[in-house]
A protein has these predicted regions:
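Short beta-strand immediately N-terminal to the catalytic nucleophile in serine-hydrolase-like folds
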Residues: 1-2, 25, 118
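Gly/Ala-rich beta-loop-alpha elbow adjacent to hydrolase catalytic centers
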Residues: 1-10
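Conserved alpha/beta-hydrolase catalytic His-Asp/Glu region
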Residues: 55-102, 107
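Short beta-strand/loop motif that positions the catalytic acidic residue
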Residues: 110-112, 117-123
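Conserved beta-strand scaffold positions in the cores of enzyme catalytic domains, especially
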Residues: 115-117, 140-143
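Catalytic histidine-centered segment of alpha/beta-hydrolase-like enzymes
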Residues: 125-126, 143-158
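Active-site-adjacent alpha-helix of alpha/beta-hydrolase-fold enzymes
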Residues: 132-139
Length: 158
């Protein structure tokens, strides 16, 4: 199972070893839009996020989380976690490079095990319109009324 960037990692692992099921949460096999892919982030938006992270990673991550939920207590708890357990710049840089350079569309299509994708109808990073692509690629999908952090939703179930 993988969420967001973790979905790329889970997809890669499932392509290399036998797994019983692949579950992706708010994930895309290609997170950056290009000429033949419209189910990701616009490159200029991603580049702005990268620059913001380099300037002030804690502030940028807190802002990112704030845009994903309307539950103030959840946001406060996540902000505290970001403050208490800050990511290293090298970890952030590595993750951003994976996002920028990964395109696992063919890899995902070739995985023969059972696949399920949980999407958020309000997700601005992995748009819900990817649902049709996932279903055409042999995956079951489930859509929640949530943003990029659907596991914060009370209806989230695996």
């Amino acid at each position: 199972m993988g969420w967001s960037l973790g979905g790329l990692l889970s997809t890669f692992v499932a392509s290399q070893i036998k797994v019983n099921k692949l579950i992706l949460v708010a994930a895309s096999p290609c997170l950056i839009n290009n000429t033949d892919w419209e189910f990701g982030i616009e490159s200029h938006v991603f580049n702005q996020f990268v620059n913001n992270l380099k300037n002030d990673s804690t502030k940028s991550l807190k802002r990112f989380v704030s845009l994903q939920s309307k539950d103030k207590s959840q946001i406060q708890e996540l902000h505290q976690s970001i403050q208490k357990f800050p990511a290293s710049q090298s970890a952030l840089d590595s993750g951003l490079q994976i996002i920028l350079n990964s395109d696992l569309r063919d890899t995902f299509k070739n995985i023969s095990t059972s696949k399920k994708c949980i999407l958020g109808s309000l997700d601005t990073l992995v748009p819900v319109k990817i649902q049709d692509w996932y279903e055409a690629a042999g995956s079951k999908t489930h859509v929640l009324r949530s943003g990029h952090l659907p596991f914060l939703d009370n209806d989230f179930k695996i």
